[in-house]
């Protein structure tokens, strides 16, 4: 994958970091704005790539907050020190998928980058899991104590 499709980022204090390698740039992958109350409150702009890879590094595991709500099948990864939400993680056995909050890219996308509003409230658990497996980025590494 080209360096142009590599995005590095993390929380404000550096406790949570990641490397997202996409098969395409944001002009192809796009940005989404979920309309749930959590994402609206955080003004999230997320992206993912089922053909890409995600590597997540947690320096101090005790400062990683995993927040669950709604259907309770996804961990929203938040730094307990600085309060930044870096993305959502869905795990199943030894596999995991991630959608990343592009606002935590270094540098983040321009404020005027097009964002597609999305609403998944009508999905039941099987439909939501299937969509995420189809569309979210596979996690290649999730390292605690990095």
Language-model region placement:
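A short Gly-Trp-Pro
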Residues: 1-10, 15-146
């Amino acid at each position: 994958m080209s360096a142009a499709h590599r995005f590095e980022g993390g929380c404000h204090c550096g406790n949570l970091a990641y490397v997202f390698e996409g098969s395409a740039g944001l002009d192809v992958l796009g940005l989404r704005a979920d309309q749930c109350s959590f994402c609206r409150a955080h003004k999230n702009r997320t992206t993912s790539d089922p053909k890409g890879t995600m590597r997540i590094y947690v320096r101090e595991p005790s400062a990683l907050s995993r927040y669950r709500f709604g259907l309770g099948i996804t961990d929203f990864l938040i730094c307990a020190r600085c309060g930044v939400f870096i993305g959502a993680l869905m795990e199943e056995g030894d596999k995991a998928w991630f959608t990343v909050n592009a606002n935590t890219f270094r540098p983040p996308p321009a404020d005027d980058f097009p964002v597609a509003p999305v609403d998944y409230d009508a999905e039941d658990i099987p439909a939501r899991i299937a969509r995420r497996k189809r569309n979210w980025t596979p996690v290649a590494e999730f390292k605690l104590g990095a």
